A protein has these predicted regions:
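Solvent-exposed beta-strand/loop surfaces of large extracellular or lumenal domains
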Residues: 450-454
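Acidic, Ser/Thr/Pro
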Residues: 429-431
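Extracellular glycan-modifying ectodomains
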Residues: 1-398, 407, 417-419, 424, ...
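Residues within well-ordered beta-strands of beta-sheet-rich folds
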Residues: 421-427, 464-466, 477-479, 491
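Exposed aromatic-hydrophobic patches
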Residues: 410-412, 461-468
Length: 496
């Protein structure tokens, strides 16, 4: 039956609906023939995993499950809750505790966040750029009146601590958008909330209020007059068609369900900006000829929502990932202001850091750095890409690359929440250029990874790279053309 299901799915569904983007997962690759006893022992498990992923129709089955769970009033996914009014709430335990006040900043966490803000501010000031930090409140904060009493705030939240204590320690300008958006929620009407009922972001009216508040804050810091942006009663508010404007429909495989219709919110004559460029990891909004303030938003998913109204105040707004702040980015965008924009729940984890150039360490420098975690070097935990072949040997994991520079091997390392040193001990049979790539922040794949190239000589080589990302996602990709080496050790070291 399982064999027939795969064939039947291939015949019944159009190719577009079987594409990896529709299935929301990378296409599975069939495991190659093992070359060692450990590989043969792991083969049944790898075949079972590949076979289960090869069966199509996951989005239909998972979508049916979502509809059933919502109908029963049960959580459709982990940390996602539905209430009787049909609203969806994303409330991970760490974010809930930080917002409720039961998990406040301790001295160490406060120091980490203050240090990150201070580093960002100093980097910007060195380039003649003013720096600010903007906290976008969680939907659960702004619409707290719609939540159950047992989820109410008890003590000062991390957001409130951040606004006062962390900002003072870092000597940085911080804007908390919660008071303005809580006030805006008092103007809600049926079908016109400040945050999407079925998503996590602001509606167009919520974006307007956040943009006005941010523009007014920047003008006040500059000592400039209050910006003239559209008032609430001046907004152009045509109804938007029922769509997945900002819903969990995609993540829950429920396209066609979870539709929401809200009024738009735009200036009376329409927006004056144009989207000058949009590429992976960066968007550029330009008003008129681009003259006026330049603002760089190192922002999470709230950034583009905020940029639409900031671009009515500034001449140019560039939106980049929160972890992408670097000297190079400041030099290429040449902003007057750099704003870190993060959602409130991020305060429960790690601060956005400054992306510094990768530093190669000498082997003698590693003695003082304690080991934090090691990779398991066997074919069951590593993954070959392209024509690369991997095999377990007595001294480590053998990797033989093909002729493509994209051939490589993915080593599974535990995630890291702080900057770390990646250490690779290699025995090189065939030398060449090795590209080491890693993921930082929330990137789901290797499309926007960072990388660093090193030249491998024949014989023993130790590669030690200090990586500045605050959130290292673990997996490391080693790629190159025609390389042949043995990985004897792959580990994270603590940065002192």
């Amino acid at each position: 039956a399982a064999c027939c299901a795969v064939v039947g799915d291939a015949l019944a569904r159009p190719p577009a609906t079987r594409d990896w983007a529709a299935e929301k997962r990378a296409p599975p690759a069939a495991p190659g023939l093992p070359t060692s006893l450990a590989g043969w022992n792991a083969l049944p498990r790898r075949l079972e995993e590949w076979w289960s992923l090869a069966l199509g129709g996951r989005e239909f089955l998972l979508g049916a499950r979502t509809r059933a769970m919502l109908l029963l009033g049960a959580p459709p996914a982990r940390d996602l809750f539905a209430d009787e009014a049909g609203w969806l709430w994303y409330d991970p335990p760490a974010a809930f505790s930080a917002r409720r006040g039961t998990s406040p900043f301790d001295a160490a966490a406060m120091g980490r966040f203050a240090g990150a803000l201070r580093s960002s501010r100093e980097l910007c000031e060195a380039q003649g750029v003013r720096y600010g930090f903007v906290v976008c409140p969680d939907k659960e904060t702004v619409h707290a009146d719609k939540r159950a009493a047992e989820r109410a705030q008890l003590l000062p939240s991390r957001r409130e601590q951040f606004r006062s204590q962390v900002a003072r320690l870092a000597q940085a300008d911080v804007l908390d958008l919660a008071p303005a958006l809580v006030d805006e929620a008092r103007h809600d009407a049926p079908g016109d909330p400040t945050y999407f009922a079925l998503g996590t972001h602001w509606t167009p009216r919520g974006s307007w209020r956040a943009g006005v508040e941010c523009a007014s804050w920047l003008a006040a810091l500059e000592g400039a007059p209050e910006p003239r942006l559209a008032a609430r009663d001046e907004l152009w508010r045509p109804p938007l068609a029922p769509e997945h404007h900002d819903s969990w429909a995609g993540a829950l495989h429920a396209k066609g369900a979870l539709l929401e219709s809200v009024p738009d919110a735009a200036p009376p004559g329409g927006f004056a900006w144009r989207l000058a460029s949009s590429e992976p990891g960066q968007q550029r909004f330009v008003r008129g000829d681009g003259s006026g303030r330049r603002i760089l938003l190192c922002a999470d998913s709230f950034g583009p929502y905020l940029a639409t109204w900031l671009a009515e105040f500034a001449g140019e707004v560039v939106v980049a990932a929160p972890s992408s702040l670097s000297e190079e980015l400041l030099r290429t965008t040449r902003p007057d202001w750099c704003l870190h924009v993060v959602v409130e729940r991020q305060l429960a984890s790690a601060p956005p850091g400054v992306r510094r150039p990768v530093r190669e360490l000498r082997e003698s420098e590693l003695a003082a750095l304690p080991v934090a975690a090691r990779a398991v070097l066997d074919p069951a935990h590593a993954r070959a890409r392209g024509a690369t072949r991997i095999a377990l040997e007595s001294s480590g994991l053998r990797a033989r690359h093909g002729d493509s520079p994209l051939d490589g091997v993915v080593l599974a390392l535990p995630p890291r929440s702080t900057a770390s040193v990646l250490v690779l001990e290699l025995l090189v049979e065939r030398p060449g250029a090795l590209r080491v790539a890693w993921r930082g922040g929330a990137d789901p794949d290797f499309l926007r990874l960072r990388s660093h190239e090193v030249q491998l000589p024949a014989g023993r080589a130790v590669v030690a790279l200090e990586l500045s990302e605050q959130d290292l996602q673990g997996s490391v990709l080693l790629s190159g053309r025609g390389l042949d080496y043995l990985v004897g050790r792959a580990e994270w070291r603590e940065v002192r």
